[in-house]
Amino acid sequence: MMEVTAKLRGAAISAQKARLVADLIRGKSVAHALNILNFSNKKAAVLVKKALESAIANAEHNNSLDVDDLKVSTIYVDEGMSLKRIMPRAKGRADRITKRTCHITVKVGV
């Protein structure tokens, strides 16, 4: 079985939120997966769709695979780098805020 990979690294969303969307399309055909992502109102859906479209383009251009036969064989979301930020609070105190990122990996295959 031929598998083609696309990675979106450093996506500006937490891995926990992106996994909710990734779970929706795992194992689906790419046409059905794109349909699900188009009608999802989550921010992560836009990012996952971008990675999926990249994987489809890689399969079509680099490996000459037929798009109609492709399905999402594997999709996983790993934690990326976290940016540490400071939120000033009352009486001279400060809280730490972590702006989380993630790496989205999509594999499509026949």
From Swiss-Prot:
CDD domains recorded: Ribosomal_L22
Protein's name in the database: Large ribosomal subunit protein uL22
Domain of life per record: Bacteria
Function: This protein binds specifically to 23S rRNA; its binding is stimulated by other ribosomal proteins, e.g. L4, L17, and L20. It is important during the early stages of 50S assembly. It makes multiple contacts with different domains of the 23S rRNA in the assembled 50S subunit and ribosome. The globular domain of the protein is located near the polypeptide exit tunnel on the outside of the subunit, while an extended beta-hairpin is found that lines the wall of the exit tunnel in the center of the 70S ribosome.
Disulphides: none
Organism listed in the record: Acinetobacter baumannii (strain AYE)
Gene Ontology terms describing biological process: translation
InterPro entries per record: Ribosomal_uL22, Ribosomal_uL22_bac/chlpt-type, Ribosomal_uL22_bac/org-type, Ribosomal_uL22_CS, Ribosomal_uL22_sf
Signal peptide range in chain numbering: none
Subunit structure: Part of the 50S ribosomal subunit.
Gene responsible for this protein: rplV
Keyword Ribosomal protein carried by entry: yes
GO cellular component, one term: cytosolic large ribosomal subunit
Keyword terms: Ribonucleoprotein, Ribosomal protein, RNA-binding, rRNA-binding
Keyword RNA-binding: yes
Any GO MF annotation of the entry: rRNA binding
Annotated family: Belongs to the universal ribosomal protein uL22 family.
